[in-house]
Amino acid sequence: MKTLLLTLVVVTIVCLDLGYTRKCLNTPLPLIYTTCPIGQDKCVKMTIKKLPSKYDVIRGCTDICPKSSADVVVVCCDTNKCNK
């Protein structure tokens, strides 16, 4: 019986995804997020200036933080749900 239990524990550990995956917001709402694909371990928030008083905000996962420009402000971070 103990052998069977030990075998089940080992199989469970092997079958679980023990790798770390980042969780990033993909909307302004804090309860809605996405689990990032393997290799994308940063969260990003891009604010895109459309008109003098209108902005689009894009949130999600990335592997490399894009550079900001005159019309796009990029903020990257390395913790879960940090791209508020």
UniProtKB/Swiss-Prot annotation:
Highest taxon in the source lineage: Eukaryota
Gene3D superfamilies, per the entry: CD59 (2.10.60.10)
Give the tissue specificity: Expressed by the venom gland.
- Give the GO molecular function terms: toxin activity
* Subcellular localization, as worded in the UniProt entry: Secreted
Q: Pfam families from the entry?
A: Toxin_cobra-type
Q: What is this protein called?
A: Beta-cardiotoxin CTX21
Q: Which organism is it from?
A: Ophiophagus hannah (King cobra)
